Amino acid sequence: MTSLLLFGASEGGLFDFDATLPLMAAQVVLLTFILNALFFKPVGRVVEDREDYVLTSRAEAKKKLAEVEKLENDLKNQLKEARKAAQQVISEAEEDSEKLYKEALNLANSEANASREQARREIDSQRDSALKKLKSDSDKLGDLIVERLLAAK
């Protein structure tokens, strides 16, 4: 120990309890308050603002997604109804065209039958007229033959 005093070394060493330890503790506390005021609070505020923004954005996105799904369902229903109405219009048009086709076919058949009947009546009339004329001519010819035979005797 005497040698330590000769060289001017102080006693204690690592665990000296002098004014530096409380001074260091005060510096740590002061630095903690300064860092808290200058760094941690603003960063915490930014993180909280960002979290609020993300939560708000997610809520708005969910709301918009629900709106889009509702609109999609509405449009699907409208499309389904429009297809159904179009199919009904098509089937009604097909029925109408089939009805018109049948009416036109019946009209054409009745006109053809009427025309055929008219032609048959005209043919019958002409045949009857030809038969009457032929009978008249044959009667005249028969009378002429009888006259010639009687005149020849």
From Swiss-Prot:
What's the protein's topology in the membrane?
Single-pass membrane protein
- Membership in a protein family: Belongs to the ATPase B chain family.
How it assembles, according to the record, is: F-type ATPases have 2 components, F(1) - the catalytic core - and F(0) - the membrane proton channel. F(1) has five subunits: alpha(3), beta(3), gamma(1), delta(1), epsilon(1). F(0) has four main subunits: a(1), b(1), b'(1) and c(10-14). The alpha and beta chains form an alternating ring which encloses part of the gamma chain. F(1) is attached to F(0) by a central stalk formed by the gamma and epsilon chains, while a peripheral stalk is formed by the delta, b and b' chains.
**Chief location bin:** membrane
Function according to Swiss-Prot or TrEMBL: F(1)F(0) ATP synthase produces ATP from ADP in the presence of a proton or sodium gradient. F-type ATPases consist of two structural domains, F(1) containing the extramembraneous catalytic core and F(0) containing the membrane proton channel, linked together by a central stalk and a peripheral stalk. During catalysis, ATP synthesis in the catalytic domain of F(1) is coupled via a rotary mechanism of the central stalk subunits to proton translocation. Component of the F(0) channel, it forms part of the peripheral stalk, linking F(1) to F(0). The b'-subunit is a diverged and duplicated form of b found in plants and photosynthetic bacteria.
Organism this protein belongs to: Prochlorococcus marinus (strain SARG / CCMP1375 / SS120)
Record protein name field: ATP synthase subunit b'
A single Gene Ontology CC term: plasma membrane-derived thylakoid membrane
